[in-house]
A protein has these predicted regions:
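Hydrophobic alpha-helical membrane-embedded segments
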Residues: 44, 343, 425-437, 560-580
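Alpha-helical transmembrane segments and their helix-start/interface "positive-inside/aromatic belt" motifs
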Residues: 29-42, 169-179, 371-380, 472-487, ...
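Membrane-entry segments of alpha-helical transmembrane domains in multi-pass membrane proteins
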Residues: 1-11, 27-34, 74-92, 130-143, ...
Length: 683
């Protein structure tokens, strides 16, 4: 297996970035497009070839390209790793990434920064592929920081808008908070294991069954902090909704399908650490469950179509954390895959709607589009049913597997199951709310005059021009990727159809070598909290009880999803006056949720304002202007004073020189007489 040349996979996208980044401004648009698409297509073909040939790996394949850092006893190699987990991530990143690159040809076709957009997209692919291929935590961190940089650049793509620039800075800073945890975890790994290589760290843990708790809990919680920042979980989730200021293809690729799932990938990659710490697992599951529910309630009240999907993304990432937190890593990763399909499709379909309406994103100004843009309608319908959890679509399979694994995991897991089930109902409600408001009823564009005629990609329309705007279907470059993703939403669930429902759960068996630790001769240690909580059985996949239980839970979940659909149908199709009446009746609750629980305002008062105060009045006013500027001014004045004195001495008058010499001679004689010179070692 020496012919894999894994380093070539991220090489092509970075070449595309360099070519378009350096010369794209002078290239014709067709050449920019060709460079970007080739840079996305070649890695996809490379990955397809590798997966076809090496999907049956029983041990990770590590491809080292020499020592990268050597500092004393610590050595870090520039190495890539291939196993089933990295294969899954490679397929998602390159496959969905290629489709979104194709979609962007039509969506971004009229943009002035067309070349810059594709350069940044290729740069993101390079760093994301580096992240998932890395064989050690240090190289993973390089990719981790790189995707954050690409995210910042693409969120702020419309840099002339203050909202986009501020959103980019917000995302960058919140992610840096999480990255502190990642860095501290690496320091602990070096201090305790002397290495950052996955194989060495996990091998050391696997060979020592007595090692659990303590240091592993600390490392697991610090890694979790990094994952929480990157994957937008409580308390660092607030950057993701604002990230919708970027172009819609960016929202689909980076802030839905790939980058935001990096935290889930890291937890699955480090599963051996989490399996040895019940506290770390409990924390992962608790954060995921709480985030899923909180974000779902926020999504119910949003009117911007992209922000609804943003909160939905935060919520679905919470499901993935829940899956990993109950040690059902295969289920969590499978939901990562299916989510990439249906959430990317939802964003692309939303982009098609926005493109059709000349930049409109407010759902209150939409309606009646299902007959005017039928391909967009039917593809988005597939995604809505998938995320809502209706069988046999992929979202039903992956989400229900997580809920089932939580239910059978422990007593605490049943609490997580109940909250996850409630979240599923809310998800169905707000997704069908989006569906009805966007595609059904009459067009509300004229009636909704206060809806800003805002444009998301430099399209400035007057109200009259917008009303006259010809509603038409998007170009084929946008519709073909959407259609492919819709097909995947329908059929991908078969890959992980549970055995308890009559399937083979092929995906779980495929991923098992990478998340079971079998190649390390490793068996998860059964650790339990004193309360008999979540750690009762920290196995990678909970044992399956009788099939009847899984069937019953699947039926319950489907009924809950159906109830959410029925509620949305009643409120946004049958009786459209109900939302306004309920809002008036429960105004306090509505205001709380509509304002997102004022979390941003609380952070602003408790964190941002004190930091700005310290920066402006302590660091800037006192330290910068007082100490640094004042010290510099004092030094300058002192030097100027000595210079003036020296200038007076250097007068050119011989009598003046004689006077100064006489004065200094007298001073020297006095010093000798009183013995002052002995204090300075002068004899």
């Amino acid at each position: 297996m020496t012919d894999l040349h894994l380093w070539l996979i991220p090489l092509v996208p970075v070449a595309g970035f360099l070519v378009n980044g350096l010369f794209g401004r002078r290239f014709p648009k067709a050449l920019v497009t060709a460079v970007a698409i080739v840079a996305a297509a070649v890695p996809m073909l490379q990955v397809a070839s590798i997966v076809y040939r090496f999907s049956s790996l029983t041990r990770p394949f590590i491809e080292s390209h020499g020592t990268w850092i050597a500092a004393g006893a610590f050595h870090a190699s520039f190495a890539f790793q291939l196993d089933q987990l990295s294969m899954v991530m490679l397929c998602v990143v390159t496959g969905v990434g290629f489709l979104i690159h194709v979609y962007s040809i039509g969506y971004m076709g009229e943009e002035e920064g067309y070349w810059r957009f594709f350069a940044y997209m290729n740069l993101f692919l390079f760093f994301m592929l580096t992240l998932v291929l890395s064989a050690n935590f240090l190289l993973m961190f390089v990719g981790w920081e790189g995707v954050g940089l690409a995210s910042y650049l693409l969120i702020g793509f419309y840099y002339t808008r203050d909202s986009a620039s501020n959103a980019g800075k917000k995302a960058f800073l919140y992610n840096r908070v999480g990255d502190v945890g990642f860095l501290l975890a690496m320091f602990l790994l070096i201090a305790h294991f002397g290495t950052l290589n996955f194989s060495d760290v996990f091998g050391a843990i696997g060979s020592n069954p007595a090692m659990h708790g303590g240091i592993l809990t600390a490392i697991g919680l610090l890694l979790l902090l990094g994952a929480v920042g990157k994957s937008a979980q409580i308390p660092l989730y607030v950057w993701l909704p604002d990230a919708m200021e970027g172009p819609t293809p960016v929202s689909a690729l980076i802030h839905a399908a790939t980058m935001v799932t990096a935290g889930v990938y890291m937890i699955a990659r480090a599963h051996i650490i989490y399996d040895r710490s019940a506290i770390a697992l409990l924390t992962v599951a608790s954060i995921g469950t709480a985030t899923a529910l909180l974000a779902a309630t926020m999504g119910m009240m949003q009117n911007d179509i992209k922000r609804v999907l943003a909160y939905s993304t935060v919520s679905q990432l919470g499901y993935m954390f829940l899956g990993c937190g109950v040690a059902a890593y295969s289920a969590g990763v499978f939901h990562l895959v299916t989510h990439a399909f249906f959430k990317a499709l939802l964003f692309l379909a939303a982009g098609s709607v926005i493109h059709t309406l000349g930049g409109e994103q407010d759902m209150r100004a939409m309606g009646g589009l299902r007959t005017k843009i039928p391909v967009t309608f039917w593809t988005m319908t597939a995604a809505v049913f998938a995320i809502s959890g209706f069988p046999p679509l992929c979202g039903f399979v992956s989400k229900d597997e997580i809920l089932y694994q939580a239910f059978v995991h422990s007593e605490a897991g049943k609490v997580f199951w109940a909250v996850g089930l409630l979240t599923a109902g809310l998800t169905s409600f707000y997704m069908f709310r989006l569906w009805y408001m966007t595609f059904f009823g009459e067009s509300r564009a004229v009636a909704y005059e206060e809806a800003a005629v805002h444009a998301r990609h430099d399209t400035k329309l007057t109200l009259e021009a917008e009303h006259a705007h010809h509603v038409h279907e998007s170009p084929k470059s946008m519709l073909v990727p959407m259609t492919i993703l819709a097909i995947l939403c329908v059929i991908a669930g078969g890959l992980g159809w549970p055995e308890g429902l009559g399937g083979t759960n092929w995906f779980s068996h495929f991923l098992a070598p990478a998340v079971s630790g079998a190649h390390l001769q490793y068996e998860p240690v059964r650790v339990a909290l004193a309360t008999g909580g979540i750690g009762a059985s920290a196995t990678n996949q909970a044992p399956a009880p009788a099939n009847n239980l899984e069937i019953i839970l699947a039926i319950v979940s489907t009924l809950v999803a159906l109830s959410g659909w029925c509620a949305a149908h009643l409120m946004y199709y049958k009786r459209r006056d109900l939302p306004a009446r309920l809002t008036a009746r429960f105004h306090a609750i509505y205001s709380l949720v509509f304002n997102k629980y004022w979390v941003d305002e609380i952070y602003g008062a408790l964190v941002v304002a004190p930091v700005l105060f310290i920066a402006r009045w302590v660091l800037a006013a006192l330290v910068d202007r007082g100490v640094i500027d004042g010290g510099g001014l004092l030094a300058g004045c002192t030097a100027q004073g000595f210079g003036s004195l020296a200038a007076r001495i250097q007068s050119g008058n011989i009598r003046s020189y004689a006077g100064w010499l006489a004065a200094f001679a007298a001073l020297l004689l006095v010093a000798v007489y009183f013995g002052w010179t002995t204090h300075f070692g002068i004899r």
